[in-house]
Amino acid sequence: MSRRRGPRRRGPRRRPRPGAPAVPRPGAPAVPRPGALPTADSQMVPAYDSGTAVESAPAASSLLRRWLLVPQADDSDDADYAGNDDAEWANSPPSEGGGKAPEAPHAAPAAACPPPPPRKERGPQRPLPPHLALRLRTTTEYLARLSLRRRRPPASPPADAPRGKVCFSPRVQVRHLVAWETAARLARRGSWARERADRDRFRRRVAAAEAVIGPCLEPEARARARARARAHEDGGPAEEEEAAAAARGSSAAAGPGRRAV
């Protein structure tokens, strides 16, 4: 069974901190702060008569006394006031500022601004370390040579110079590729080099086999083989001895390097 909760109690309202700006309530008339600049919403008009300023304005709000004008019921017509405007300004006594325009209330006096600090004279510069000085010098020389090379017109070849087989465009850039020595050698030789090595190896093996099998394929070796086969079929010991003697004689005639089969 769920517990029933009563109405939520609200705690005490937080009081604004001292010195925090007051937030105006919605719908309340906006009151300009002392020293604030006039805005488009306030529609302030300069007061030509200091006596018509708002008397209820605080003493610290000099902006309201200077700019705010409250119209009265017994004001004369605008046309009459406009006609006497030049005469009133001509007969009006000079202001306290000596004819100068009044300074804005928000503008700070010139005496209040602190003078700019005097510039410190730079002393003699410290010498650079050797490696930095060398690098600076080489960089300066390189930039000077580069600028001189850019200013100099490109050298054109003479007319009687022999023309090469290949003419590169000035836009072509040649970049040297770095390759391993083995890869470069194989690229120069190609696949035919390996095929030639294989053919040489096969030729040597065939020659070695012919040196061993060649004596067995000669006519004399074949005749001895036939005689030995007949003697074996007949079974006579005399014929076997003759075949063995003939084989020994043929091996002696062939030489020590050859072997009779």
Swiss-Prot record:
Residues 16-31 are annotated as: 2 X 8 AA tandem repeats of P-R-P-G-A-P-A-V. Residues 101-111, 244-261 have a biased composition (Low complexity). Residues 1-17 have a biased composition (Basic residues). It is found in: Host cytoplasm; Host nucleus, Host nucleolus; Virion. GO terms for biological process: response to endoplasmic reticulum stress; symbiont-mediated suppression of host autophagy; symbiont-mediated suppression of host innate immune response; symbiont-mediated suppression of host translation initiation; symbiont-mediated suppression of host type I interferon-mediated signaling pathway. One of its GO terms (molecular function) is protein serine/threonine phosphatase inhibitor activity. Residues 75-88 have a biased composition (Acidic residues). This is Neurovirulence factor ICP34.5. It comes from Human herpesvirus 2 (strain HG52) (HHV-2).
